Amino acid sequence: MGLLDAKISNHNVLVTSVDNVLNWARLSSLWPMGFGLACCAIEMMATNASNYDLERFGIFPRSSPRQSDLMIVAGTVTMKMAERVIRLYEQMPEPRYVLSMGSCSNCGGPYWKHGYHVLKGVDRIIPVDVYVPGCPPRPEALIGGLMKVQELIRMEQIGISRAEALKKLEEKSFDPGIVLEHQRKSQAVS
């Protein structure tokens, strides 16, 4: 044990970067705004139920875009609705994130071919950070997507664009079984 180690242990000094502190604060207080449009909204509501307890991840749902930093688009986005989605997105403060939940918001879903009124993916009007596939995706998949957003926030650095951070995140693999295993353990303890 050196002189520096003794000084740190005696005076409770914390050594970290500003990036780590800012990212920890942002990922520990993620405030999503749900934009439930179809079947996926039911699964999104189930995810907010007490048996999944999103608050343990620091996720507190908000109903105002001015208080949220994550928009969850869950369901079919029509052409008439596109302008409203853009307006809500622009009202969100920076840094803001978008999670696209379900086949309809990802690529148009079953309406992509013959639905002239359906937008063929919400990413055509606003930038999407994380996609959650499924029709509708289970709550565990949505929790996995929320954890991906938190991982994206954790990897952000001052001076590095979000596109570079997304590229790094895509290089990592994500196992949705981890969420299921964690849930089973927490239910066994209860």
UniProtKB/Swiss-Prot annotation:
Binds 1 [4Fe-4S] cluster. PROSITE patterns: COMPLEX1_20K. It holds the Pfam family Oxidored_q6. It is an enzyme of class 7 (translocase). Its cofactor is [4Fe-4S] cluster. It is found in: Cell inner membrane. One of its GO terms (cellular component) is plasma membrane. Belongs to the complex I 20 kDa subunit family. NDH-1 is composed of 14 different subunits. Subunits NuoB, C, D, E, F, and G constitute the peripheral sector of the complex. This is NADH-quinone oxidoreductase subunit B.
